[in-house]
Regions:
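Non-catalytic, surface beta->alpha helical segment in thiol-disulfide oxidoreductase systems
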Residues: 107-137
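Structural micro-motif
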Residues: 98-106
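Short active-site neighborhood of thiol/selenol oxidoreductases, capturing the structured segment around
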Residues: 46-58
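Thiol-based oxidoreductase modules, predominantly thioredoxin-like and allied folds used
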Residues: 78-92
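Typically the conserved alpha-helix immediately C-terminal to a functionally engaged Cys/Sec
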Residues: 64-77
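Anionic-ligand binding region
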Residues: 34-42, 48
Length: 137
């Protein structure tokens, strides 16, 4: 019985991890106040079509790989910006945005409003669908 419960939990985790969901409401993000960085340099610049806001921690084993993956997307696609916020010692940010795992990625529209949220390593086809809705190709 315990083995069955563990199997169901593992399958559920694999299916849901990296999937995103639309965000209801119009919550705007101020990158400057969050302490967002781009290549280690503070920034408050949004992408012309979309911004990928990655929340990471020092201890996140998957965050560097996701950072590289999203930076490559930014390089390939026009109008897209990728920025990062380290929440290792900033529990107030994790609480404000209900972040329980890293990486967590928010897709922001050109006004800085959260339109999509992904917990874990993003599934690229799903992320691309959301970016295309914002005109990123």
């Amino acid at each position: 019985m315990l083995l069955l419960a563990a199997l169901v939990a593992g399958i559920s985790y694999r299916l849901l991890h990296g999937r995103g969901h639309k965000v209801a409401g119009k919550q705007r993000v101020d990158l400057g106040r969050l302490g967002a960085t781009k290549n280690g340099v503070p920034t408050n610049a949004l992408g012309k079509k979309a911004t990928l806001l990655q929340f990471s921690t020092e201890y996140c084993g998957q965050c560097p790989g996701v950072r590289r993956q999203l930076a490559q997307l930014e390089y390939r696609l026009g109008g897209l910006c990728h920025v990062e916020v380290d929440i290792t010692e900033r529990i107030e940010i994790a609480a404000k945005f209900n972040i329980s795992q890293t990486p967590t990625i928010f897709v922001l529209n050109p006004s800085g409003e959260i339109v999509y949220r992904i917990g874990g390593v993003p599934k690229m086809p799903l992320l691309m669908q959301e970016l295309e809705k914002l005109g990123v190709k």
